[in-house]
């Protein structure tokens, strides 16, 4: 199981998750995408949420899948899951134990289960648990996606520091957009220096699909 988080919201988790799953499936690795918790959605009028996009991809493998099969807590409010849950469904806190069981059931059918979190590692799910706690409970490997803008060095190093302090395998990958020419002169020089001293180098996502698939499966 691979848990995908990010340095922050809008870093490109969903895009990267879909690209990695498509690559894995093309390589013969049967891969499903799950979005157990999603906020800022209105399923009655908007069918382009992260989970809807995942469902579209997943149905290439199993036409019987529905949104409820891959996304279990869905809220209208654009906020951390804890805040949305307390406002919209205060008597039904998110049960990560139940989620863990449901997500692990997919490992019986699929070679690789990709779980996308909401926001970054410290986003609260309950008063006691955040996204990193959830990934640890799942015993999943972690793929952390970084944006490619100015400030990514600080964001990557902070997340690397946090992840190193926990017992889980992780990789950090930069979601490099094709039109970002500034990255190569502003941020890449430090990333290359960092990688010479680190036993867990930061990679560029688009250049590392094979590496990331191998990491997820090993």
From Swiss-Prot:
Keyword hit for Cytoplasm: yes
Short name of one Pfam family: AAA_26
One cellular-component annotation, GO: cytosol
Record-listed E.C. numbers: 6.3.3.3
GO molecular function: ATP binding; dethiobiotin synthase activity; magnesium ion binding
Active site: 35
Oligomeric and partner information: Homodimer.
Subcellular location: Cytoplasm
Function noted in UniProt: Catalyzes a mechanistically unusual reaction, the ATP-dependent insertion of CO2 between the N7 and N8 nitrogen atoms of 7,8-diaminopelargonic acid (DAPA, also called 7,8-diammoniononanoate) to form a ureido ring.
Protein name: ATP-dependent dethiobiotin synthetase BioD
Pathway membership, UniProt: Cofactor biosynthesis; biotin biosynthesis; biotin from 7,8-diaminononanoate: step 1/2
Residues that coordinate or bind substrate: 39, 151-154
Gene Ontology biological-process annotations: biotin biosynthetic process
Reaction catalysis annotation: (7R,8S)-7,8-diammoniononanoate + CO2 + ATP = (4R,5S)-dethiobiotin + ADP + phosphate + 3 H(+)
Annotated domain remarks: Substrate binds in a cavity formed at the dimer interface.
Binding site for Mg(2+): 14, 50, 116
Residues spanning the signal sequence: none
Record: residues binding phosphate: 35, 116-119
Family note: Belongs to the dethiobiotin synthetase family.
InterPro entries cross-referenced by the UniProt entry: DTB_synth_BioD (IPR004472), P-loop_NTPase (IPR027417)
Cofactor(s) it depends on: Mg(2+)
Alphabetized UniProt keyword annotations: ATP-binding, Biotin biosynthesis, Cytoplasm, Ligase, Magnesium, Metal-binding, Nucleotide-binding
Residues at which ATP binds: 9-15, 50, 116-119, 175-177
Enzyme class: ligase
